[in-house]
Amino acid sequence: MRKIHINNDDNYATPPDFYEALNKRFNFDFDPCPYCEGEVIDGLSIDWGNSNFINPPYSQKLKEEFVKKGIEEMRKGKVCVFLIPVSTSTKLFHKYIKPNATEIEFIEGRIKFGKLDADGNFYLPLNSKGKTQSGTKDSMVVVFDGRS
């Protein structure tokens, strides 16, 4: 299985409370792009679980590849729940998300993405002024549900 390198600026952890709220509804059994440092397993080259949570790297190319893979997995009868930035003017949204999503939810406010320490504990990094800050983009939850 090939490994890919994720730029640390493109690699943030989902806040646990946000994830758990979605997990209660969808009962996730797989995350093809979990938070980690450095070299990671390429979630694009493997089959996904039956119920998947995906917070992909936000760089355009990787985000688009993960959305396309999510649509493929949906067509196999799986559920893929994405947490991605709102970008409704893009080709990605109009060609892939809008015609295939079974649900789109726009998140009020901005999510405070974080990092994980060596023990796996979530924390919010501080900016140059010593304060935590929200993400720089609005977010949406996009569901591709192939169960029906």
Model-predicted segments: where are they?
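Class I S-adenosyl-L-methionine-dependent methyltransferase catalytic core
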Residues: 1-148
